[in-house]
């Protein structure tokens, strides 16, 4: 398990990476980071929320498709419920919101 400061640094790097990938690829999303929450909003107002939950050292995604909790395991963020990869879930949510294929590369 990471220390709290390692977790915060890792999650901030991940949030920054997501924003950079969206900007570099020109996808139609607005990103806002405030506190522990990265809000990604599609052109039609659909939101995908990526949240850092420091006490459990988890990342959470909330989207129309549902809510997911991810814990770091061997360098990957995997869903606590079904071991789905963070990027797979995020890319599906972003693609559904935008109506086009979105693929955030792994950090």
UniProtKB/Swiss-Prot annotation:
Q: Which GO terms describe its molecular function?
A: ferric iron binding
Q: Which InterPro entries match?
A: CyaY, Frataxin/CyaY, Frataxin/CyaY_sf, Frataxin_CS
Q: Which GO terms describe its cellular component?
A: cytoplasm
**Gene Ontology BP terms:** iron-sulfur cluster assembly
* SMART domains linked: Frataxin_Cyay (SM01219)
Task: Print the keywords alphabetically.
Answer: Iron, Metal-binding
Give the protein family.
Belongs to the frataxin family.
Free-text function comment from the UniProt entry: Involved in iron-sulfur (Fe-S) cluster assembly. May act as a regulator of Fe-S biogenesis.
> What is this protein called in UniProt?
Iron-sulfur cluster assembly protein CyaY
Native organism is Neisseria gonorrhoeae (strain ATCC 700825 / FA 1090)
């Amino acid at each position: 398990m990471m220390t709290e400061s390692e977790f915060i640094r890792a999650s901030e790097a991940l949030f920054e990476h997501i924003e950079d990938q969206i900007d570099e690829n020109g996808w139609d999303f607005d990103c806002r980071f405030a506190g522990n929450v990265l809000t990604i909003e599609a052109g039609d107002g659909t939101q995908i929320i990526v949240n850092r939950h420091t006490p459990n050292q988890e990342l959470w995604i909330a989207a129309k498709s549902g809510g997911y909790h991810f814990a770091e395991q061997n360098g990957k963020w995997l869903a606590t419920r079904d071991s789905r990869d963070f990027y797979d879930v995020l890319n599906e949510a972003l693609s559904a919101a935008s109506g086009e294929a979105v693929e955030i590369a792994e950090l």
